[in-house]
Amino acid sequence: MPSQLEALRRHTTVVADTGDFETMRALRPTDATTNPSLILKAVQQAAYRPLLDQVARDHRGAPLAEITDRLLVAFGRQILDIVPGRVSTEVDARLSFDTRATIERARSLIALYEAAGVARERVLIKIASTWEGIQAARLLQQEGIRCNLTLLFSLVQAAACAEAGVQLISPFVGRIYDWHKKAAGAQWNEAQQSGVNDPGVQSVARIFAYYKAYGVATEVMGASFRNTGQILALAGCDLLTISPELLARLDATEGEVPLSLSEPLPGAALPKALPSGEIAFRSLLNEDAMASEKLAEGIRLFVGDAQRLDDLLRAAGAY
């Protein structure tokens, strides 16, 4: 009998969600994703600290933003030596509400990758799913820079990303689950709210169904998992990005994995189309307390980790 990881691969592209590229080798993911928190975690390990020190030393005196991007690209290049597919590298979360600055930073990251001999087709630029971020992605896609819209918690964000023609979205399963569990308090029933009844799983399933019903080409990559049950309940999603710990657990567990998500049947009723435009986006997002709160919280967390990464680079003598 196959492992659950092997069985999952029959339905879904498996992506490693980590900056720890050495851990990836045994798990053989197709793609990999990184973010400021994962890179910060990696460079605090003895195995990866020399990479930070080398980048800081080689580019001492350059603007701190450039040195940070060079560190992200250094990790990305190492990852691309391991995975056959793509790596996602994130634009500084401090630019989440600045369309022009996001575009400029994304261009800079792609230029660094291309200067290192990496084709832009192997890189996804991660951008927070704010209105400003989505508009930046719209223009970047037109330039051939493929984007991964992250910190996505709602169908309204997903619909705006589809309309903008982005390459891929990353709806966050675990953080949606966290919000609903906290909101329910003592009324939360873990057994009843697991698997296909998990609110995070249901959110991704709705987005997936909406995209497939309307023929949206944007890829859906479920992210931010708390347990393997959430992962297995989304078998059939275009991609799933999974932490090394949960990948190892799937690899160590035997069992078939049934298909959970699939294309709609011919003639199936279309879900209600969401209105487009900035006013509708901001209004509908504002009405969704969970999505509004988790988007703001996610940006704050990534900004905090970006600042801590800056501090490490300064301590290493980069600036």
UniProtKB/Swiss-Prot annotation:
Annotated keywords: Cytoplasm, Pentose shunt, Schiff base, Transferase
Known catalytic reactions: D-sedoheptulose 7-phosphate + D-glyceraldehyde 3-phosphate = D-erythrose 4-phosphate + beta-D-fructose 6-phosphate
Family: Belongs to the transaldolase family. Type 1 subfamily.
GO biological process, one term: pentose-phosphate shunt
Record's function text: Transaldolase is important for the balance of metabolites in the pentose-phosphate pathway.
UniProt pathway: Carbohydrate degradation; pentose phosphate pathway; D-glyceraldehyde 3-phosphate and beta-D-fructose 6-phosphate from D-ribose 5-phosphate and D-xylulose 5-phosphate (non-oxidative stage): step 2/3
Subcellular localization, as worded in the UniProt entry: Cytoplasm
E.C. no: 2.2.1.2
Protein name: Transaldolase
MF (Gene Ontology): transaldolase activity
GO cellular component: cytoplasm
Family matches, as Pfam families: TAL_FSA
